[in-house]
Amino acid sequence: MEYIALTGIADSLIEVLKKHNLRTLEIRSPQNFVGVLGLNAGDSVLLTSTSLQDLTDGTQGLIAKVVQKQVSVHSVVSSNELYIEEREAMSARIQLECRCMARVRSVISNELGKPVKVDAREISCYEAR
């Protein structure tokens, strides 16, 4: 099945999601942010600790269902007598519900500025490799 993949997610966070079933993540990395923009409540997403550059066939991850999504903009203004500087940063918060473990069959799309898409299949906890 085809999924949007969020890469470089901390192993500890994936373990917490497995144990507690429902967690909210704040996504700030540009590539994962683009992926989250392509998700809606009810969609499934693949989370993996593997970096974007190392994502290949056989990579393992966790499939989770998106319960909620929220995109926000944070503005920071700093100034002195000479200038005023305003910076904005966008982030997304997604609430995820753990579904199952999965293994990537193939990477469909891995282009900069576009959601990372993979074809993955669910795996049981007894499947060895």
Where are these regions (language model features)?
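Compositionally biased, charged N-terminal/linker segments
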Residues: M1-A41
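Short beta-strand-centered aromatic/proline hotspots
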Residues: L55-H74
